[in-house]
Design a protein with these regions (language model features):
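Loop/turn elements at helix/coil->beta-strand transitions in domains of secreted/extracellular proteins
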Residues: 19, 44-46, 66-67, 116-120, ...
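Binuclear metal-ion centers of metallo-dependent hydrolases, dominated by the metallo-beta-lactamase
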Residues: 113-122, 126-181, 259, 280-325
Length: 325
């Protein structure tokens, strides 16, 4: 179990190199209520941002650096980012609760970051066109699809413009710093979750335009943006990481993720066991009995730590205990 925020994964090999994993959360050194994202840096220099959420201050956040690729699991506000952070996460007074200062991001935090960093956005199915429009709203020009080459569907970064990649079931892409050299393989895997944009949460016609927005709202319907996804990342040092996204327990955790990909590390999204996604009991079962990684990072707990330590009596503490740590 790795409950801390600044993480280095050391692959035990003759020529070992590290994959750096960092949380860009509401408050540095804490696991806060709205923290959803992780930033992965491969030894080759490829940098991948996972589910940006609302705890990054848009594309100008100084913690970002280069962002070559952004992964999005689904379009719920806390993952795509209907708001962005409006505080210094390093300040001693920085908030760590759901009321931490934020400002509206009408085209989503993800699109602001991609437009500023010329990132390649990897998503499942219908989400690519939805995200492309949000980036176009910011840049004023259409957002192209990302190029690919070779048997591994390779794409070289950094790029000079943002682009989108639409992966279907079983799809893979490889992101590399230099053409012909090894890179990070990104494979899409299923998730069981809702993937809708609620028109009632849209404060303007930017998120959903009329007449679609009005027609959906008048009929009490959300906009469905294709199926949600998870990912398996294979880094150049051999490390494989399973990103569950928001999901319930599913057979593919065993048949596809464990048996085929065999990840060493899993990042599992956990909640209080309500209707949204797995609670600590379900998540512990999924990790220990189905996925069987060597280490686990819990995410999405909606609970703040204190002084970087897990608060007793919380779902985070319950999950750790169930994992036998």
């Amino acid at each position: 179990m790795l409950p801390t925020l600044g993480l280095l994964w050391l692959q035990p090999a003759a020529n070992a190199q590290t994959v750096k994993i960092t949380s860009l959360g509401s408050r540095t050194g804490e696991f806060c209520e709205l923290d959803r994202n992780l930033l992965f840096e491969d030894p080759s220099g490829v940098r991948i941002l996972y589910d940006p959420g609302v705890t990054i201050a848009g594309g100008t956040d100084p913690r970002l650096g280069e962002i070559h690729t952004i992964l999005l699991t689904h379009v719920h506000n806390d993952h795509i980012g209907n708001q962005k952070l409006n505080q210094d996460p390093n300040a001693p007074t920085a908030g760590c609760t759901a009321t931490a200062p934020q400002t509206l991001a009408p085209n989503f935090n993800l699109a602001e970051i991609a437009a500023a960093k010329n990132s390649a956005i990897i998503v499942g199915r219908n989400m690519a066109t939805f995200v492309a429009v949000k980036i176009q709203n910011i840049r004023g020009v259409p957002t192209p699809g990302c190029p690919s080459a070779g048997l591994g569907n390779e794409m070289t970064v950094p790029r000079t413009t943002p682009c989108t990649i639409n992966l279907g079931d079983g799809g893979k892409r490889t992101v590399t710093r230099f053409e012909g050299e090894s890179g990070v393989q990104i494979a899409i895997v299923p998730a069981l979750h809702d993937n809708t944009v609620s028109p009632s949460l849209a404060s303007s016609n930017v998120i959903l335009s009329d007449p679609l927005r009005t027609n959906l709202t008048d009929n009490g319907l959300p906009a469905i943006v294709g199926p949600p996804t998870g990912y398996v990342l294979t880094f150049t040092n051999g490390l494989k990481v399973y990103l569950t996204g928001d999901t319930g327990i599913m057979a593919e955790m065993d048949t596809l993720v464990n048996r085929f990909y065999q990840p060493s590390l899993a990042v599992v999204n956990v909640n209080a066991g309500n209707a949204a996604l797995m609670g600590p009991e379900e998540a512990a079962f999924a990790m220990s009995r189905l996925v069987k990684p060597k280490a686990v990072i819990p995410l999405h707990m909606i609970e703040a730590t204190t002084g970087g330590r897990v608060n007793p009596g919380t779902n985070t503490a319950r999950f750790i205990a169930l994992m036998g740590v």
